[in-house]
Amino acid sequence: MEFHITEDDIASVLTEALPFPVEDTAVKISRDGTIAVTAAVTRQALTESNLVPGKLRTALLFLPERCKLYGAWSAAVPNGKLSLTCRTIKLEGFTLPEQTAQALSDAFAAQWNTRMEQRDFTPQTIQWQDGEAVLLG
């Protein structure tokens, strides 16, 4: 059994999983297993999400109202669940804290795992192609 994940699928699930709205989302899946995402987010949405810790929240005041968000993840399927590891996540070129990266990764993976559970699918491995990841069960 196979579960295909396309770049459009990732953009859609990411939009659902994030605790703040994003626009202009672009996703690139590479054969090396990298999932790269760019999106635009407003400073106000980030502030209201409570995802950004105190000191960084102050720094948000100095960013433009509309900010570029970039993230790159790798994926694995330990124990029949999709797990995402954040390689980097940046807002306007500034690296976000590890706790923020982990929270986003966990929310993103949880959304995928819910979808697979709804289809009674348990992944065992991932095959990477340009533009698509194929989970094999």
Q: What is each residue range found by the language model?
A:
Residues 1-137:
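Extracellular/lumenal and peripheral-membrane lipid-interaction modules
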